[in-house]
Structure formats: structure tokens, C-alpha cells
Amino acid sequence: MTGSRSPIPVAELRILGEYRGLLFVDKPAGLQTEPDARTTDTLLSRLATQLREPLSRLHALSRLDTGVSGVVTLGLSPDARRMVQGWRELGRFRRRYLGLATSALNATSSTSSTSSTSIGAWSESIGRASGSLRTVGGRNPESAHTDYARVASAALARATPSTLHLLALAPLTGRTHQLRVHCTAHGLPLLGDRAYGGASRFISDSGAVTALDRIALHAAWVELPLSAPFRIESPTPAFLLDIWRAFAGDATAFEQARRLAISSAELPSPSTDATDLD
């Protein structure tokens, strides 16, 4: 959690689950999802080596920014890719992210944590800003919708006059940097997200400075609309838990953030088996 970012160790990637040509992989923060002209050491290239598969066979159907960790969905066949596309068009491919964000300290904040939950939705369109960045509105904007819950909050140290929030986020669309842009637009920049105004460090009451070398955002699970529940989960990384425990003490709120229904897409409904959506 401290110091500059070091190279991601070359270790075996964790396979979280498989289903009919879909592969679910646990991406560590700091590792790019796909190769490009500048980066060849990526999740897909490492996985191709690990599985002894040609890189061309692996297609990321959900992509995580380099500084973000968690579940990445891969399609190993055209049929698998069409299956996920069908779920998306029906709004049935569910995803849950956990994030730690800050806001300005307000008059009602206290030094103790609170589990008061607020639920809502953000629906501002997102377009291009400078370089690779995105912004609300912007150039060539596209519709974007994020359901969210502010699950718990805690005051940061006296030397850092702001409030820490545990967020549960459910994107219904998949725009570039969508969650990061929406959080910042609503005064809740994610810790470590320097590109979008997030704090790059914080200071404890003892004066210790903690530098953040990743974004405090984790893709916790994806859920497939099968006749029986099929949820693929990635454990909450120690990075997020350690920060929360330092200021709020009790990390059980993370389990609530995983399970809380925060959008109509996550309410109980008759399941449709994947065979109906091919």
C-alpha cells in the first residue's frame, strides 16, 4: 500500500470459474487487461502462456483498468461471446464493484464509523476529455448508468479532513472509466485515482503518510442469469480491507456491500437459462 508501484510478480493467475466457453479470471491491480502497442505483459498474455493457448483465442468481455482488481470475463469462442452479448442486451449480466472514496468532511461527520446506507443511481452521459480521459458530457458522449449504494462511512484522521465511504457499484452500461467518472462527478473520487481527482495518499493521526499505488476499486463479482444461481466472486483484496480497518475498525461492511440489492436488475426475478439466450 505504500511506496511506488512495483512490477506485478509473474505468478499463476487465479481462475475463478468456467461456464460454456467463458473463463473468469482474478486480475491483480497493476496489470493491464489486454496488450497494446506499448504493453505486452498483460492479463491476457500471461493467461495465454499459463493455459498454453494462442493469445488470439482469448477475448476480454469485461475489461478492468490497470489500477483496478477483480473479476475479468473472457470468451473463448464466438458462441460464448454472443451469449454474453445477449445477456447484456437484456440487462441480465450483473456486476458488482466495491470502492473506497472520499468526500469533504461535513458538519454531521464524526470520528466513528456509521453503517447508514443510501442507495441511488447516476445516469449522466460520458464522453471524451483530454487524452485518454473521460468526463461527464464531453465529446461524443454516450449514455451511462450506474446504480450505487453508500454502504458505510468513517471520518479520516484529523490531519486529513474528509470522510471515507465504502461504495457498492453496479454499472448497467460499460463505458470507459464509467465508475471512476461517475464517482468523481458526484463528489466521491476513488482513493488512489489520481487521474480523476482521487487522493494519492493520506495521513494518520500519528503523522504517518500512506501512499496509494493503486485505485481503491475492485470488481467483486459477476452473476450469470442461469436457472440456478451462478455468481463468480473475487475475494476483497487486503489493500481495501486494511484501509477500512484503519479508520472504521470493522470490515464486515464489505460483506454487506457484496450482498446488498442496489438496482432493479438485481432484484429476484424468474431466471432464464443460458440456452434460451444463445
Model feature map: region roles:
Residues 1-17, 21, 28-33, 112, ...:
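Pseudouridine synthases involved in rRNA/tRNA modification
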Residues 86-87, 125, 182, 193:
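Residue-level signal for well-ordered alpha-helical positions
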Residues 26, 73, 99, 148, ...:
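Residue-level signal for inorganic ion chemistry
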Residues 62-63, 138-140, 211-214:
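Short Gly/Pro-enriched turn/cap motifs at secondary-structure boundaries
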Residues 175-183:
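Short beta-strand segments enriched for Tyr within beta-sheet-rich domains
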Residues 39-43, 48, 88-96:
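A short alpha->loop->secondary-structure connector
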Residues 55-92, 178:
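Glycine/acidic-rich beta-strand-loop module
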Residues 31-45, 83, 101-165:
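Glycine- and acidic-residue-rich catalytic/RNA-contacting loop of pseudouridine synthases
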